[in-house]
Regions:
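Bacterial N-terminal signal peptides that target proteins for export
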Residues: 2-12
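Bacterial N-terminal signal peptides
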Residues: 11-20
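Beta-alpha junction/loop-to-helix N-cap segments that form part of ligand/metal-binding clefts
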Residues: 30-32, 45-55, 59, 64-140, ...
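Venus flytrap/periplasmic-binding-protein-like
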Residues: 79, 127-129, 134-138, 215, ...
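Extracellular/periplasmic Venus flytrap/periplasmic-binding protein
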Residues: 85, 135-136, 144-254, 291-299
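Periplasmic-binding protein-like
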Residues: 93-108, 126-130, 178-183, 209, ...
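Extracellular/periplasmic periplasmic-binding protein-like sensory domains
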Residues: 250-330, 410-413, 424, 436-438
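Segments of small-molecule ligand-sensing domains
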Residues: 310-323, 334-408, 412
Length: 443
């Protein structure tokens, strides 16, 4: 009996060891993406759409063999777009999952990005703030681990002002015009106030800044002020529920929707559909179009959505602005990982190694064509000095049913913005005791 028990114990131990080795081997060939997501609260539409697209793209990559055989894994932690919860989620997820190392963090929140910036830098984990974030983090010599991919906030408002200039008949026609900016009362909303004042001074237009307290349900006083001011244009820097409320409020005071330009977080179907007829004619910027007429979207539909694995609770949101932004974000994260593997090996990588991949992203038309994303993602080229890589937008207009593109690419005035960015980054470096990298020595 004792002999039998010993054999059973030995067999059990061997089974446990084998299981552990199998699990370890599996985790050893997985790359982890920690997701500080938000699917409840006033900004749930943005969070659920974005993270739905991001996750579906990761599933699509796995369905096609992963990244050079390395499978992608992820887990979510609900932040409700609350900074404190975002920090808690960061700390909970940063260490990886079952042995799979974390590649990058993508919180889709300016507040959470600001709160975790120093932590992610210390932990050597890339912080991705696509189309938002801290503008001076564009300067990678000071912010090596932060990437405001495609479009930083300064580029956003600069491109909008350039477009207004085009609509008025030339940049010189901006002089004497009245432009009101209705902005979300958060770090995100306030990020561009200073540079807008600089742009107003340079171009000679009259600027009025109007704050809307979070979350944006009440805007009556701001729109009564706009009715009194009679601005030529209104720039809407909203988020979540603030956007449809703004469009309805504009209609009530008689301000035309076709002279309101929404920023990058005021450009989705979820921003206009709740406003009904008040949204018809509304213009917004975009770094990517909505729609499903892209091979990568069709691939996701075939291998993920039609297979019953799609992440969206409402399949009708497939191909919408927020969803497609999540897909774009997935493409950029995976391409950074793929590029880093070329340097460090086809295996799971550390955040420090993945950072190199982000900093060397170079997506030209040929690569975008190969990814099935030409026309969905703008060409990007990053470097040590430039963690944005794009800086261009297109303008779209809501016809009551869908978004229609109404412009070619409009570039921000990057030559004007660069000294402002560098001065701000230098100030941060001095305050934090950081020695900027010599980008000429980076490879």
């Amino acid at each position: 009996m004792t002999h039998r028990l010993s054999l059973r114990r030995l067999a059990l131990c061997l089974a446990l060891i084998t299981a552990g080795l199998t699990a370890g081997a599996q985790a050893a060939n997985e790359q982890y993406f920690p997701l500080q997501s938000y699917r409840v609260g006033p900004y749930a539409a943005g969070g659920s759409g974005f993270f739905g697209g991001f996750i579906d793209y990761l599933q699509y990559i796995n369905a096609n063999g992963g990244v050079n055989g390395v499978k992608l894994t992820w887990s979510e932690c609900e932040t409700e777009y609350v900074v404190e919860k975002g920090v808690e989620c960061y700390e909970r997820l940063k260490g990886g999952l079952n042995g799979a190392p974390a590649a990058a963090t993508n919180p889709l929140s300016v507040g959470i990005a600001y709160a975790t910036l120093e932590r992610s830098t210390a932990d050597k984990l890339p912080l991705i703030t696509i189309n938002h974030g801290r503008t001076d983090s564009t300067d990678g010599s000071v912010f090596p681990y932060v990437f405001p991919l495609q479009l930083n906030p300064y580029s956003e408002v600069s491109a909008i002002i350039n477009y207004i200039g085009q609509r008025e008949g030339g940049a010189d026609k901006l002089k004497g015009k009245k432009i009101a900016v209705l902005y979300h009362g958060s770090p995100y909303g306030k990020e561009t106030n200073g540079v807008l004042q600089t742009l107003a001074k340079n171009a000679g237009f009259e600027l009025t800044l109007l704050e809307v307290p979070h979350p944006g349900n009440e805007q009556q006083s701001q729109w009564l002020n706009i009715r009194r001011l009679k601005p030529d244009w209104v720039i809407l820097r909203g988020w979540g529920v603030m956007n449809p409320v703004a469009l309805k409020s504009a209609q009530k005071v008689g301000y035309p929707a076709d002279h309101i330009i929404g920023n990058i977080w005021s450009n989705s179907e979820e921003d206009v559909v709740p406003a009904g007829a008040a949204a018809k004619g509304f213009i917004s910027i975009t770094t990517h179009p909505s729609g499903t007429d892209f091979p990568v979207l069709q691939g996701i539909a075939q291998s993920v959505v039609n297979a019953g694995k799609g992440n969206l609770a409402d399949p009708k949101r497939f191909g919408t602005v927020y969803y497609n932004l999540g897909v774009v974000n997935g493409i950029l994260n995976v391409e950074a990982l793929r590029l880093a593997q070329e340097k460090y090996g086809q295996k799971p990588l550390t955040g420090e190694q993945v950072r190199w991949g982000f900093e060397h992203l170079n997506l030209d038309d040929a690569r975008l064509q190969a990814l099935g994303a030409k026309g969905l993602v703008q060409p990007l080229k990053l470097s040590c000095a430039d963690h944005e890589g794009g800086g261009a937008v297109r303008f779209q207009q809501w016809d009551g049913q869908r978004w229609n593109l109404i412009s070619d690419w409009v570039q921000a005035d990057r030559a004007l913005l660069r000294p402002i960015i560098e001065a701000s980054a230098a100030g941060y470096a001095k305050e934090k005791g950081i020695t900027p990298r010599d980008c000429s020595q980076e490879q």
